[in-house]
């Protein structure tokens, strides 16, 4: 019989395949990168067993569980677990605490002729390990923030650095009111877990100094871990600069051309209409901060640009609202932020200079 695995570091460093035997509702709240949910019980079955446990105790709940998962249902679930185990002989299974549910799955697999290891301590122990991983990195490593006006290409700079943490990538969101992607965001727990695994793997490769973008606490619906966000308030900063023309072009590419293509790839014929709706919604989100007259003017420019794009495929008219939004909203806001964080800025420059500086920078 295989021993339980409690080497959580090895599990995440090597991307060990795992099947999560918790109910779907638990899995949706938070899991780990690349894990497959193959539950012992459905949400409804779990709820009934939980109610029975509260009213009649553990033994009655176990009996009910075996009644609910029996016959053809039991055989189908064993087959799914067996298929996973055969496809991933180096894999593992787990439940919430490494308790009864994973023991039952392991036992039923054994009866089907397959010995398969469990994660000792289950989801809870692995989650604690990853939270500790982030805390330890904050205490032991060097961090620097990358700031800059909207559209300067901070994400592209991060993508060229081996020691970057792509917070927006892990959150699947570009970080602004216009940052939502065609695909949804992970749960907050999933976001935190992805970040922790990224930190773990980079530290294993010898990285001890990290670059990350200067972000608000919320990246869309994902909240930065509080210890990370708090530490970011005092970190040194590098400020990325670029011309207005380059910034407008980059925003046009990212938030119009590429985002539209994303929506079409995901939603097919409805893609453009959904993209247009999302763009207008994003502008409406900052209606109060823009003020009524300015919002209305930019809204009409955006509507006209979308109509032209729908008619001819030409995206050039989008430049008008992009330039207006930068000049009248984002740039003044970022100029204020730069002034307030000025004492923390240790270097500023355009792409090449910033890349060179960050690659050569010694930990502080």
UniProtKB/Swiss-Prot annotation:
Function: Involved in the post-transcriptional modification of the uridine at the wobble position (U34) of tRNA(Lys), tRNA(Glu) and tRNA(Gln). Catalyzes the conversion of 2-thiouridine (S2U-RNA) to 2-selenouridine (Se2U-RNA). Acts in a two-step process involving geranylation of 2-thiouridine (S2U) to S-geranyl-2-thiouridine (geS2U) and subsequent selenation of the latter derivative to 2-selenouridine (Se2U) in the tRNA chain.
Record keyword Transferase present: yes
PANTHER family to which the protein is assigned, alphabetical: TRNA 2-SELENOURIDINE SYNTHASE
Xref: NCBIfam families: PRK11784.1-2 (NF008750), PRK11784.1-3 (NF008751), tRNA_sel_U_synt (TIGR03167)
Family matches, as CDD domains: RHOD_YbbB (cd01520)
MF annotations from Gene Ontology: transferase activity, transferring alkyl or aryl (other than methyl) groups; tRNA 2-selenouridine synthase activity
Name of the protein in question: tRNA 2-selenouridine synthase
The species this protein was found in: Pseudomonas fluorescens (strain ATCC BAA-477 / NRRL B-23932 / Pf-5)
Disulfide-bonded cysteines: none
Active site: 95 (s-selanylcysteine intermediate)
Cited InterPro entries: Rhodanese-like_dom, Rhodanese-like_dom_sf, SelU
Its EC number(s): 2.9.1.3
Encoding gene, per UniProt annotation: selU
Family: Belongs to the SelU family.
Domain Rhodanese: 12-135
Keyword S-adenosyl-L-methionine included in the entry's annotation: no
Subunit structure: Monomer.
Catalytic activity: 5-methylaminomethyl-2-thiouridine(34) in tRNA + selenophosphate + (2E)-geranyl diphosphate + H2O + H(+) = 5-methylaminomethyl-2-selenouridine(34) in tRNA + (2E)-thiogeraniol + phosphate + diphosphate; 5-methylaminomethyl-2-thiouridine(34) in tRNA + (2E)-geranyl diphosphate = 5-methylaminomethyl-S-(2E)-geranyl-thiouridine(34) in tRNA + diphosphate; 5-methylaminomethyl-S-(2E)-geranyl-thiouridine(34) in tRNA + selenophosphate + H(+) = 5-methylaminomethyl-2-(Se-phospho)selenouridine(34) in tRNA + (2E)-thiogeraniol; 5-methylaminomethyl-2-(Se-phospho)selenouridine(34) in tRNA + H2O = 5-methylaminomethyl-2-selenouridine(34) in tRNA + phosphate
Biological-process GO terms, alphabetical: tRNA wobble uridine modification
Key words of the record: Selenium, Transferase
């Amino acid at each position: 019989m295989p021993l339980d695995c409690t080497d959580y570091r090895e599990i995440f460093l090597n991307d060990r395949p795992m099947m999560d035997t918790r109910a779907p509702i638990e899995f949706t709240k938070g899991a780990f990168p690349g894990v497959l949910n193959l539950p012992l019980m459905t949400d409804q079955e779990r709820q009934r067993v939980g109610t029975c446990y509260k009213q009649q105790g553990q033994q009655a709940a176990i009996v009910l569980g075996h009644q609910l998962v029996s016959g053809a249902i039991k055989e189908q679930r064993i087959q799914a677990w067996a298929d996973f185990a055969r496809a991933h002989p180096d894999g593992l299974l787990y439940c919430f605490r490494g308790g009864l549910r994973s023991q039952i799955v392991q036992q039923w697999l054994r009866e089907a002729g397959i010995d398969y290891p469990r994660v000792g301590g289950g989801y809870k122990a692995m989650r604690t390990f990853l939270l500790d991983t982030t805390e330890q990195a904050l205490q032991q490593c060097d961090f620097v923030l990358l700031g800059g006006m909207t559209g300067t290409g901070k994400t592209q700079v991060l993508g060229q650095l081996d020691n970057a943490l792509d917070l927006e990538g892990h959150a699947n969101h570009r970080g602004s009111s216009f940052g939502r992607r065609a695909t949804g965001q992970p749960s907050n727990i999933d976001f935190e877990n992805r970040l922790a695994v990224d930190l773990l793997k980079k530290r294993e490769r010898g990285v001890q100094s990290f670059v990350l973008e200067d972000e608000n606490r919320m990246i869309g619906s994902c909240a930065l871990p509080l210890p990370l966000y708090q530490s970011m308030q005092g970190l040194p900063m590098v400020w990325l600069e670029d011309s207005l023309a380059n910034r407008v072009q980059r925003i046009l590419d990212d938030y119009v051309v590429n985002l539209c293509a994303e929506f079409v790839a995901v939603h097919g014929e409805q893609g453009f209409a959904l993209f247009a709706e999302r763009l207008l919604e994003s502008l409406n989100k900052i209606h109060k901060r823009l003020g009524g007259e300015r919002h209305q003017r930019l809204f009409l420019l955006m509507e006209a640009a979308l109509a032209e794009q729908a008619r001819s495929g030409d995206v050039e008219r989008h430049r008008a609202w992009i330039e207006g939004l930068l000049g009248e909203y984002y740039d003044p806001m970022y100029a204020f932020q730069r002034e307030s964080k000025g004492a923390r800025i240790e270097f500023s420059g355009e792409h090449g200079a910033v890349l060179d500086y960050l690659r050569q920078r010694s930990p502080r």
